[in-house]
Amino acid sequence: KPQDDVIISPQSVQVKGASGDLQISPDGAVIRNGQALSLNDSQRQKAFSYQSALRKQLPWIDDGAQKHLEKARAALDKVIVKELGSNSNVRNRLTTLNGQLKQQMNRIIEHRSDGLTFHHKAIDQVEQDGRNIVQQSMGGVLQDSLNEMGVKQAANSGGNPLQAIMGNLGGLQKAIQNEWNNQEQDFQNFGHDVCNRVTALETQRKDLLKALK
């Protein structure tokens, strides 16, 4: 797991934490713990490549996470419209959940007016909070689904309404579960991709620190 915070701005990329305090300008100049370092070509090239990689990868990770959340919302929304109709309140719940999860993401990769800040210590807390938010939201989804099916059933009442509701709810749960599994697989693939990129960045960071000794 990353051990540093990263602060990206037009003037520099700052890496703070296990690495001490490194500031790298877009041309590869380095200030370490407040001291400007005099670098040879190879050191400057490593510093330049590392800050370029951070400038590229952090927005890629942030953008990818936002897109995956939106894709999951749209896919689940389709299931809800099909099963409960376009007026279902569950659709609002999904939109709210999407917004809440994006806010959680912003605790890890914070958007500033002049760039991004990556907070490495927020990762574990956000994982936990995110899980709680999803669980609470799913409880609300279930409650709304029951209510809405009850209303629907009362309108078409014939036979045993409770049995019909439970049957419909089983169908809805299955449809949501199937779609959720699809999206989860997608998220996992994205997660692996992120891990590979973070590992590559860590390798670059270590190489740079070794070169600066």
Located regions from the model:
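General structural signal for secondary-structure boundaries
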Residues: 38-42, 46, 118, 161, ...
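Extended amphipathic alpha-helical interaction segments
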Residues: 88-185
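A cross-kingdom marker for long, charged
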Residues: 163-213
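N-terminal Sec/ER secretory leader and immediately downstream segment
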Residues: 1-98
